């Protein structure tokens, strides 16, 4: 049986995401070409999956983008830890009653975060990521709410 994650789990996952992703942005050096390329590859894969309406793949590639954000910390231990966080998020996404509704809005915002980082605007990238994580958490909690009453 697949473990179902509840609202408290989601809040905890987003606490971890905020800690790692916002720290990665604030502590980052200017993006190196290979770092930008990895992020852009994840964004392009997300775009292709969205065009195919393969929402599970959209979620997977979007999370790969966020793994590359955490990768800016240059810590194999954080990378490994965040891989586990991503796996748990995938479980949550899969249990959301309408994964397409959840996944649809994020690509443009991921791209904006990349572009701000590429331009060296860490404060704006951090603000955009913070708002992104707040909105993502709230939407995910809303999507999970109907199923939590059963």
Q: Where do the protein language model's features map onto the residues?
A:
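Membrane-interface catalytic loops of GT-C/OST-like multi-pass glycosylation enzymes that act
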Residues: 99
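Short linear motifs at protein or domain termini
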Residues: 1-30, 137-150
């Amino acid at each position: 049986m697949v473990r179902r994650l509840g609202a408290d789990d989601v809040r905890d996952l987003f606490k971890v995401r905020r800690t790692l992703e916002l720290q990665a942005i604030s502590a980052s050096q200017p993006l190196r070409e290979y770092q930008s390329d990895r992020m852009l590859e994840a964004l392009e894969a997300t775009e292709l999956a969205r065009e195919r309406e393969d929402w599970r793949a959209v979620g997977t590639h979007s999370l790969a983008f966020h793994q590359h954000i955490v990768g800016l910390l240059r810590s194999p231990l954080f990378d490994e830890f965040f891989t586990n966080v991503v796996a748990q998020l995938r479980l949550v996404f899969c249990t959301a009653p309408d994964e397409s509704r959840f996944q649809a809005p994020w690509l443009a915002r991921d791209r904006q975060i990349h572009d701000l980082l590429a331009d060296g605007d860490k404060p704006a990238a951090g603000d955009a990521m913070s708002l992104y994580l707040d909105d993502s958490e709230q939407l995910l909690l809303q999507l999970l709410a109907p199923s939590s009453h059963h």
